[in-house]
Structures are given as structure tokens and as C-alpha cells.
């Protein structure tokens, strides 16, 4: 196994209290219990499938599923490279956490190595993991007719009884968190209704935040059930979202596009406490119910949000620093980050943010493989 630096070992050790094993549900929710029981027979049937070997004799099989917070988007080099015929519009990159973790898991334990199949895709929803074909929307050198649809990630990853570990980072797009940020940005630039008011008492045709979270919970239950059915012998690890918003909305510089732009301070506080934290809690609650492992990357990233200065932030703001191939304008909107010599980053982790997530996910995978 490749030697690790003292700093790397310390970083891994510091995650011990942040990665919780699966277990009983801390806050029982009747609907969650009813839905999970509904899929229980299917999972029980999966358990009766004869167990195969842990994988090929010389390797463990790890599948990484998820959205842009897993794929990377603008962090590092595109993977596959620009110009490669196999590019699929999913914006996976070399410095996103799956690739970072893969490099750290070379020959672990001695005599075996971890083989990564990364099928994460920008803009993926929970449904895109398990059920539906996704049409990628990468703005980077799209083909003339647009990107062709890709199969559900469970299918793309070819999950089976030889899969040892599955990591999943998804949920934000099903909640439509990115769209909520843009709506909050729009409402913040004009007097009138706040973002909180808009989503707690929404207009006709718009879901309330309460309904959004309930729907995400139901979708997550169904998705995890299908992952277990597809990979009955795998250790399943879910990954939450980092602290992209500050602990105090007033910490943000209003109108600074490198932070959260025109979003009102009170709405930032609402987005943090009533949207982002409940989303993570929902993911953790469902994960615990299935007996899987949840990786918390929120706590360790507090103080490194989008409103921190460069060098401290682990999340870029509405506009931010990104690789040269990434666009400075957001198609279909008036957002133009070129005016401040930045690129459109829409509150996504930078390389430091992915490195933090990688340390936590790496430790969770090591534990999972030792228990396999």
C-alpha cells in the first residue's frame, strides 16, 4: 500500500466521529417506516440470493453514483478528456472526490486494490440513479444535437452481486436546490416577497418546501431499495451535502456574485436551517433505516462556505474560480460572470471541498471493506 503522510493520517483520524455506522432510526417517521416496510419483502428476497465472492481475486469493486457534487463539474480535468468520443455530458472530473479517493485506496488491503466505476452525472436526480434515463446538460462542448440520454446510474454501473461498495451522493436536484437558489437570487434583487415566503406559501404549480422534503424522502427510500436489490452483497454508503451556506446570513456581502449575490440575509438563514439541513437529515434518516452508513460532510465544512474569502472557502459562490474550459455565462439567463473575470459555479465545491469529502468517504470505504 502506498505510504500516507502524517497529515493525511491525521485527516482520516479526524473523521472518526463524523462517519456514523448504520443503525436504528433516531427520529421515527411513520411514512418512512411504512414505505420501507413496503420494500422489505423485495430486500428479503435479495438476501436469499447466494452470495458470490467479494469480487475479482485481486480487486474490490466500488461504484460511485451521484450528482454534480460527486461528479465535480469544474474541478480538475474533464474525465473523459475533452475531445474524447466517449464523453457523455456528465462533467466528471479528475479532482472530484471519487477520483481522489481511488488514488488513496491503491492496494488496500495489501494484495488487492479498489477498482472504481464512476457514473455520477451533473444535474442527476434520485430518479436518475434508479429509474429514469437522464439527458445531460453539460455546457462544455456539447454536440450539435445535444447530449444523448444516459441510462439510470444503477444500470450504467452494472451493479451486481460482485459489487463490494456503492457510494451515493444525490438529493439536491430532486429538491431542486439549485433552482431555489436562483429564485432566491431573483427575489432578493427586488422588493416584495421573500424566498422563505415563496416556498412556504408557494404559488399554484410550485411545491412547498414541506412537500419537497416529503417527496425526496419517498424517492430516496425507493432508490436505496433498488440499489440493495441490484447489489445485494455491497456495503452502501450515502454522502450528505457540505455547509455551502454560512452559519449567519449576515456574513455574506450582499450583491457579491463571488458569494451568494442578492440573496437576502434572512433567506440565507432560511435556506440553511429549513432546506439544506433538513435535506441532509432526510438522507441520514433513510440511510439509518436501511442499516447503511451515512457520511456527514456538513460539520467539517462549517466555516468554509461560499461567503468566505478565497483560500478559506471550500465552495465557490454564484460566480467563482473554475477551470478554463468552464463557461462564464449561464445559458438562458442574464448571469454573466465574465464581468468580474469569474466563471459560473452556482455554489458548488472547489478542489478543497472535494478533498474534504474525499477524506471522509475514504475512511468510510476502508471501514466497509474491512467489514466485508
PLM region spans:
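Conserved N-terminal glycine/acidic-rich loop preference
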Residues: 165-168, 192-227, 237, 241-280, ...
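Oxyanion-hole/transition-state-stabilizing segment in secreted/luminal serine hydrolases
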Residues: 73-77, 128-211, 243-246, 341
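Structural recognition of the beta-strand scaffold that forms the well-ordered cores
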Residues: 61-73, 115-120, 164-169, 174-176, ...
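Secretory targeting and sorting signals
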Residues: 2-56
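Short amphipathic alpha-helices and their capping/turn segments at secondary-structure boundaries
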Residues: 53-64, 148-167, 221-235, 362
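Serine-esterase "nucleophile elbow" of acetyl-processing enzymes
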Residues: 56-123, 185-192
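Charged, often glycine-rich, active-site loop that binds/positions anionic groups
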Residues: 120-150, 305-322
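Mobile gating loops/cap/lid regions near enzyme active sites that modulate substrate access
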Residues: 246-277, 284-347
Amino acid at each position: 500500500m502506498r505510504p500516507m503522510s502524517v497529515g493525511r493520517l491525521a485527516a482520516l483520524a479526524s473523521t472518526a466521529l463524523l462517519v456514523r455506522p448504520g443503525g436504528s432510526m433516531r427520529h421515527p417517521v411513520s411514512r418512512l417506516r411504512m414505505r420501507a416496510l413496503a420494500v422489505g419483502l423485495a430486500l428479503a428476497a435479495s438476501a436469499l440470493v447466494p452470495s458470490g465472492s467479494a469480487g475479482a481475486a485481486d480487486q474490490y469493486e466500488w461504484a460511485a453514483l451521484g450528482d454534480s457534487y460527486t461528479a465535480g463539474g469544474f474541478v480538475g480535468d474533464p474525465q473523459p478528456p475533452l475531445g474524447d468520443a466517449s464523453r457523455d455530458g456528465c462533467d466528471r472530473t479528475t479532482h472530484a472526490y471519487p477520483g481522489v479517493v481511488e488514488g488513496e485506496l491503491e492496494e488496500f488491503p495489501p494484495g488487492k486494490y479498489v477498482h472504481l466505476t464512476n457514473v455520477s452525472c451533473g444535474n442527476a436526480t434520485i430518479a436518475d440513479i434508479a429509474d429514469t434515463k437522464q439527458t445531460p446538460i453539460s455546457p462544455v462542448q456539447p454536440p450539435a444535437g445535444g447530449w444523448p440520454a444516459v441510462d439510470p446510474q444503477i444500470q450504467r454501473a452494472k451493479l451486481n452481486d460482485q459489487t463490494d461498495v456503492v457510494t451515493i451522493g444525490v438529493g439536491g436536484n430532486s429538491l431542486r436546490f439549485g433552482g431555489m437558489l436562483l429564485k432566491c437570487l431573483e427575489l432578493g434583487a427586488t422588493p416584495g416577497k421573500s424566498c422563505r415566503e415563496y416556498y412556504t406559501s408557494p404559488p399554484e404549480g410550485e411545491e412547498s418546501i414541506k412537500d419537497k422534503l416529503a417527496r425526496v424522502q419517498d424517492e430516496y427510500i425507493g432508490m436505496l431499495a433498488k440499489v440493495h436489490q441490484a447489489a445485494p452483497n455491497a456495503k452502501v454508503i450515502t454522502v450528505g451535502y457540505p455547509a455551502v451556506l454560512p452559519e449567519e446570513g449576515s456574513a455574506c456581502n450582499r450583491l457579491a456574485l463571488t458569494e451568494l449575490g442578492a440573496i437576502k440575509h434572512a433567506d440565507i438563514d432560511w435556506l440553511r436551517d429549513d432546506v439544506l439541513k433538513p435535506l441532509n437529515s432526510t438522507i441520514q434518516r433513510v440511510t439509518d433505516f436501511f442499516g447503511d452508513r451515512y457520511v456527514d460532510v456538513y460539520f467539517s465544512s462549517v466555516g468554509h462556505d461560499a461567503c468566505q474569502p478565497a483560500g478559506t472557502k471550500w465552495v465557490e459562490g454564484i460566480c467563482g474560480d473554475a477551470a478554463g474550459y468552464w463557461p462564464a455565462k449561464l445559458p438562458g439567463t442574464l448571469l454573466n460572470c465574465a464581468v468580474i473575470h469569474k466563471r459560473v459555479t452556482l455554489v458548488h465545491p472547489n478542489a478543497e471541498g472535494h478533498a474534504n469529502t474525499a477524506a471522509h468517504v475514504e475512511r468510510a470505504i476502508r471501514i466497509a471493506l474491512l467489514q466485508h
